[in-house]
Regions:
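Short, Lys/Arg-enriched N-terminal segments with co-localized hydrophobic residues
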Residues: 1-17
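Ligand-binding clefts/hinges and TM-proximal coupling segments of bilobed small-molecule sensing domains
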Residues: 34-40, 82, 160-181, 255-285, ...
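Conserved C-terminal helix/tail region of periplasmic/extracytoplasmic solute-binding proteins
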Residues: 313-334
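Pocket-lining segment of extracytoplasmic ligand-binding domains
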Residues: 110-112, 183, 188-275
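Short, glycine-/small- and polar/acidic-enriched structural segments
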Residues: 42-175, 181-184, 200-206, 219-221, ...
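Short, solvent-exposed loop/beta-turn-alpha elements that line the ligand-binding surface or hinge
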Residues: 75-81, 226-228, 295-302
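N-terminal Sec-pathway targeting helices
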Residues: 17-30
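Secondary-structure end/capping motifs
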Residues: 244-319
Length: 334
């Protein structure tokens, strides 16, 4: 009889358990639906006015990126563009972000942009980052190019103006990479590597040349302008998809960028002020670095482009040269 009486109790307990299970299932389903709805809302909600005019720009912490910094500094709340700067620690990392659309534009080695275009990646240049501004530094005991034979010499990247300048310097002296070991090295590491004798010299963007001079661990070895007159190095390069989808914004940013370059050229004091705000170096290092760089003429002309790809071809950095119109998007110019 005890078993018979327990049946209703067991059934009641099972019923309560089933209710709890269903409540739990319903709760989970509602949470999932709520999460999906929230995600959909966040993805599709209207962008704010600032978001609609935001351009994400990648950069490395070098003097060559000064026009990008100045563009942000000169930005006004009611202006057509909002700049969102994204700092990277190396050129490969930065180029990956540009190529994949993680950023909209970048201040980047122009050779990397041309090489990406050769590889079928849709990137488009609008302007230069500066003129001149490169430096070749060697140990204090190096007195001729021949003294570099058998030693290591650093550059920031194989696809760079620094690589071109170094190859031209060696070529004039009758040397090649068989005689001097060329190593790629992050610019911030170069001054200390020179100081401890890891390398005998390097070619780099400022202020990392001036930093070695400030430390008393190196000296200027060669004037890059004597190797390649009017040499170009960095450029403002856009992700092609961003340009297609936001052409007016890309054009507005290009104008703001060129205006910033003109402002820097006309206000030398602003060059130092903005540089010190973004780059934590001594005043003397920044002052020295700014003496060898210009921002007044940022036009990536066809003549400049032809000189660039001539040198790139000459030292085997590129095989299939993109045409000027393929790489430089003149529709972005004011």
């Amino acid at each position: 009889m005890a078993c018979v009486k327990s049946v209703p109790c067991c059934e009641a307990e099972r019923g309560e358990d089933m209710k709890k299970t269903w409540y739990l299932i319903i709760g989970v389903v509602l949470l999932v639906i709520g999460g999906i709805a929230y995600g959909y809302h966040e993805h599709h909600k209207p962008k704010t006015a600032q978001e609609l005019k935001t351009v994400r720009v990648a950069y490395l912490l070098i003097t060559h990126a000064l026009p990008v910094f100045a563009t942000e500094e000169l930005e006004t709340p009611d202006g057509p563009v909002h700049v969102e700067l994204v700092k990277y620690g190396s050129w490969p990392e930065l180029m990956d972000a540009l190529n994949t659309g993680k950023v909209d534009a970048a201040a980047v080695l122009v050779e990397l942009g041309v090489k990406a275009r050769e590889q079928g990646i849709d990137v488009r240049a609008a302007a230069l980052g500066h003129t001149e501004g490169n430096i070749i530094i060697v140990n204090n005991d190096i007195n001729s190019v021949q003294d570099l034979k058998g030693k290591s010499f650093a550059i920031p990247h194989k696809q760079s103006t620094q690589k071109i300048l170094v190859d031209l310097m060696f070529e004039r002296a009758g040397l090649s990479e068989k005689d001097v070991q060329i190593v790629e090295m992050s610019p911030p590491e170069m001054p200390s590597a020179l100081a401890v004798g890891q390398i005998a010299g390097y070619s780099v963007a400022e202020p990392f040349g001036s930093l070695a001079l400030e430390m008393g661990k190196g000296k200027v070895f060669e004037d890059p302008d004597h190797l390649w007159h009017d040499n170009i190095c960095c450029a403002l390069v856009f992700n092609g998809k961003f340009v297609d989808e936001h052409h007016d914004l890309a054009k507005a940013f290009t104008k703001a960028y060129l205006d910033a370059g003109k402002y820097l050229d006309e206000h030398p004091e602003a060059q130092k002020e903005i540089s010190l705000k973004y780059m934590k170096f001594k005043d003397s290092v920044i002052e020295r670095s700014l003496k060898v760089i210009g921002f007044g003429d940022l036009a990536l002309t066809e003549d400049r482009y032809n000189a660039l790809v001539h040198h790139m071809t000459h030292i085997d950095l590129i095989k299939n040269v993109p045409s000027y119109s393929e790489f430089v998007d003149q529709s972005l110019l004011p």
